[in-house]
């Protein structure tokens, strides 16, 4: 079969970084083609070039044998290329229907007929299999529902090439299954799907072929994904063998460092109690809506709590806001690192130093020399991959952004408790190992760590103990010797006769 999409010697550089170097591969018509690589490997840059968002320095893109000369996203759109990014491109203030038909509103005599628009979109969504109210404002939807709207938009536009960048990172299992069904239907129509993901299960389930990038270069191209293995792909991604991505090892545990009794709040109505010892990593697992992130926000003081007591090293603390929590020795790395974690538009240096300024000066002012020294120390310690501490943090990969957030809190004095929500979401397998190593080092130093994750293998891989949540309650408290994937998942599933302990 002839190639439908072809990348030929694509190169793209930025100051101090060669993001892509002579990348070439082809994709057949109607194929789902996987694109993998560590964060910073060049995947996002290649997608930006394909979408017309950025121009390549050299090389060509061909679609159905025709060389593409587009220089903008609009040009790429007219060529039949649609990219669905992790950062969604919807207008929150508009309805679902208005977003799906933006720029193409059905009108008569210059007047938009809202009823016609909503009914048209409702019919299209039903046809696709997406159950979302077309009259709902996008701002009222969950992140997962917004992702489904983006995907529906691409389907309705009859694109020839659709690139999906980590499409299931915010989807529930049910939403993911709907997406997979849509991909199968698009494939049958002859649409080319470029599927960017770190999830090997999805890659093997969906993809016909696969390209692996490493350090901006083509590390491997597999025309038939069935002829490769997970271990081979991981080795190609990282350039080395990773036999145990989790790297868990037993550590001596001290006394109780964090104790929580009867914690509840507006979105967590059932009181929760637990404790974490010095050097312990306590994992929280649950399905979407189980209350994990709500618990973290209450603990940190980001949301007001109804009741409950929190003690750190036996001293009662009242984290009614994040500042109070930090003063008590507790910090949070939030679930959505782009919007709640990093300070966009600021440098790596500024993001690391922002929480430490009060320790250097009563006026919260750091000299350029102090700020640079602090940033350099944590860039080296946490192995942040960047050409310069002055680089805008938004240009870093997800794994390196997470390291910078950790560096910010490690530079804060007197931190005893770290709460980290979805520590490796959207992060490649090599960077995951590095994040886990950082957590192990912190635990070995006596820090109490609470890890919240929707990925059960991750929670089981790195935790000393697991609290399973279901419908706002603790459904199980499992010690490491008793870890069993089936039992933990069963405890996490909603049940009228809920809960107990394993």
From Swiss-Prot:
Which superkingdom?
Bacteria
EC number(s) from the headed UniProt entry: 7.5.2.12
SUPFAM superfamilies xref list: P-loop containing nucleoside triphosphate hydrolases (SSF52540)
Every copy of the ABC transporter domain together lies at 5-240, 253-496
Q: Which residues bind ATP?
A: 37-44
Keywords from UniProt, A to Z, are: ATP-binding, Cell inner membrane, Cell membrane, Membrane, Nucleotide-binding, Repeat, Sugar transport, Translocase, Transport
Role according to the record: Part of the ABC transporter complex AraFGH involved in arabinose import. Responsible for energy coupling to the transport system.
Put simply, this protein is called Arabinose import ATP-binding protein AraG
Q: Which gene encodes it?
A: araG
């Amino acid at each position: 079969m002839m190639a439908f999409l072809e990348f030929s010697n694509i190169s793209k550089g930025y100051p101090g970084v060669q993001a892509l170097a002579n990348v070439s591969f082809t994709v057949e018509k109607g194929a789902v083609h996987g694109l993998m690589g560590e964060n910073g490997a060049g995947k996002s840059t290649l997608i930006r070039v394909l979408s017309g968002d950025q121009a390549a320095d050299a090389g060509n893109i061909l679609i159905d044998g025709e060389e593409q000369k587009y220089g903008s996203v609009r040009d790429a759109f007219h060529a039949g290329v649609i990219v669905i990014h992790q950062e969604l491109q919807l207008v929150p203030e508009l309805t679902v229907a208005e977003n799906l038909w933006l720029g193409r509103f059905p009108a008569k005599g210059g007047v938009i007929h809202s009823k016609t628009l909503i009914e048209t979109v409702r019919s299209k969504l039903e046809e696709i299999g997406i159950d979302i109210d077309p009259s709902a404002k996008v701002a009222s939807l969950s992140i997962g529902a917004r992702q489904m709207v983006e995907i529906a938009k691409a389907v309705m536009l009859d694109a020839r090439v659709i690139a999906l960048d980590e499409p299931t990172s915010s989807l529930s299992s049910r939403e993911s299954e709907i997406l997979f069904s849509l991909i199968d239907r698009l494939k049958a129509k002859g649409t080319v799907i470029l599927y960017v993901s770190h999830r090997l299960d999805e890659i093997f389930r969906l993809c016909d072929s696969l390209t692996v990038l490493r350090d901006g270069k083509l590390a491997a191209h597999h025309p038939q994904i069935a002829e490769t293995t997970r271990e081979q792909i991981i080795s190609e991604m990282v350039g080395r063998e990773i036999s145990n991505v989790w790297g868990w090892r037993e550590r001596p545990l001290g006394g109780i460092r964090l104790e929580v009794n009867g914690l509840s709040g507006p979105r967590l109505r059932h009181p929760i109690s637990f404790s974490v010892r010095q050097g312990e990593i306590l994992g929280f697992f649950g399905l979407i809506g189980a209350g994990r992130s709500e618990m973290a926000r209450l603990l940190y003081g980001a949301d007001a709590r109804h009741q409950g007591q929190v003690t750190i090293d036996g001293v009662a603390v009242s984290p009614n806001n994040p500042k109070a929590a930090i003063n008590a020795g507790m910090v949070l790395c939030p679930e959505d690192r782009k919007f709640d974690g990093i300070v966009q538009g600021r440098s790596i240096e500024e993001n690391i130093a922002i929480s430490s300024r009060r320790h250097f000066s009563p006026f919260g002012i750091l000299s350029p020399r102090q700020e640079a020294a602090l940033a350099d120390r944590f860039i080296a310690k946490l192995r942040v991959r960047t050409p310069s501490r002055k680089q805008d943090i938004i240009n870093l990969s997800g794994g390196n952004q997470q390291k910078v957030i950790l560096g910010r809190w490690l530079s804060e004095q007197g931190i005893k408790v770290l709460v980290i929500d979805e520590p490796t979401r959207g992060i490649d397998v090599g960077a995951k190992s590095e994040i886990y190593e950082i957590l192990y080092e912190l635990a070995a130093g006596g820090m109490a760590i609470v890890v919240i994750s929707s990925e059960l293998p991750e929670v089981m891989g790195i935790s000393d103990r697991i609290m399973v949540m279901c419908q706002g309650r603790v459904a199980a408290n499992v010690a490491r010797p008793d870890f069993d994937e089936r039992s933990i998942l069963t405890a996490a599933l909603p049940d009228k006769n809920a809960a107990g302990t394993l």
